[in-house]
Swiss-Prot record:
One of its GO terms (biological process) is iron-sulfur cluster assembly. Required for insertion of 4Fe-4S clusters for at least IspG. Belongs to the HesB/IscA family. Disulfide bonds: none annotated. Keywords: Iron, Iron-sulfur, Metal-binding. Binds 1 iron-sulfur cluster per subunit. Pfam families: Fe-S_biosyn. Its cofactor is iron-sulfur cluster. Homodimer. One of its GO terms (cellular component) is cytosol. One of its GO terms (molecular function) is 2 iron, 2 sulfur cluster binding. This is Iron-sulfur cluster insertion protein ErpA. It comes from Citrobacter koseri (strain ATCC BAA-895 / CDC 4225-83 / SGSC4696).
Amino acid sequence: MSDDVALPLQFTEAAAKKVKSLIADEDNPNLKLRVYITGGGCSGFQYGFTFDDQVNEGDMTIEKQGVGLVVDPMSLQYLVGGAVDYTEGLEGSRFVVTNPNAKSTCGCGSSFSI
């Protein structure tokens, strides 16, 4: 997908830059960052991130800086309007999801409710 198209989920420059660096370390240019949602966590749903070299039927792929972010259709419905970012701070570095659909989030930011 092109950066010029209005996307249901944003993939920030900071996240793409970090993914690019991590993929280079893995020496597998086919890897993409997959973001997904599972049941669990202290608020009912939790975000997950993994590297994947497969894109399944129905998955949405967002390309930025030559790397891809992949989301399955079930997870995407909970992420529409959100963004995947990468932050570094006093609490460490991590990928984070900004999700306007979340009614509440836990203190760590990895769990949410709808």
